[in-house]
Amino acid sequence: MGRTYYDHGHYYGRAYRGYGWGGNYYYHYGPSYYYGGGFYGWAYNPWAAPVSWGWGWGGAPWYGYYGYYFNPYPVYASPAFWVTDYLIAANLQAAYEARAAAVAEANSGGGNPAGYNAGDDDSSGGNSAGGGSSAVVLTPEVKQAIADEVKAQIAAEKDAAAASQSASASAQDSDEKVPPALDPNTRTFIVATDLSETLDDGTECTLTSGDVLTRIQDTPDANKSVKVLVSGSQKGDCQSGAQVSVAVDDLQEMHNHFAEQIDEGLGKLAENQGKNGMPASPATTRREVADAKAEPDLTVGADIDKADKDAAVAEADAQQAAADNSQGGDDD
């Protein structure tokens, strides 16, 4: 199945492979290229010594805004931790920019977008720069769980790269198999698109891009949903520690996005290896995966852009309403 994506005026197509499980059909992301086994081994294993890395995020508005939520590691023991920070940051940066742009446009560019007040940069984490020592929502334990999933994905991609060179690869891809959304070995998911979910008491709460979930059920209910634990959430979202039911299809989309971001992170690793204190890797030569290509539909850009902006406006309004209610309660 081919999908079209539209990002900052650029269209690109992506082919998704499908397979069945439990009477349902799922689509999963496949890399558009593979590296050699040596590079995957380098990306999977620890470095000989921890690496200090300057990301250059210090003056970025999104970085200050999410200071209460996210701290990059001070040093990196392995590439998996580096990729972990890369993909968390990519999610948060994209979410901040999309919401800010959408709300600014809705307000005709007047003032700060709702929910994006400058004073919020020094929020509950007490760290306006985002990289200090104050406690943040994404705890070391949550980030370790993400890093473990990154390592597992790198190992799986290495195996897939080797299998793709064998005659049986296409046959294996068509077999029925458990999707990552339900795989007992895959528990941690990062929210990629905004979702509205219902708590056990019937009230609704929101999950937004960058929130972290831990799946605690393996068998879908009658609504094709499974229970998840909110492991890390942003202001105004479902509280950390809450349990909600999330559609299996939504979890699968989260994993697809996660896998795609890991590939982007591996690409950044390949660009930066041997520079600024990062150890050199084996050859970074890539070979294309023919069946991962899809031609983009150039007519969908405006529709995707409008849908993203509408969702961003609605989410920002909900966060502002939650903040107003909280302030009203403090005045009583």
Where are these regions (language model features)?
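Low-complexity segments
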Residues: M1-V137
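Short beta-strands and strand-coil junctions in structured, solvent-facing domains, enriched
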Residues: T198, T214, A222, Q234-G236
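SH3/SH3-like beta-barrel fold
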Residues: K224-G232
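Second-shell loop/turn segments in exported
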Residues: Y69, S196, D201
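Conserved beta-strand/loop element in small beta-rich adapter and peptidoglycan-binding domains
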Residues: E204-T219
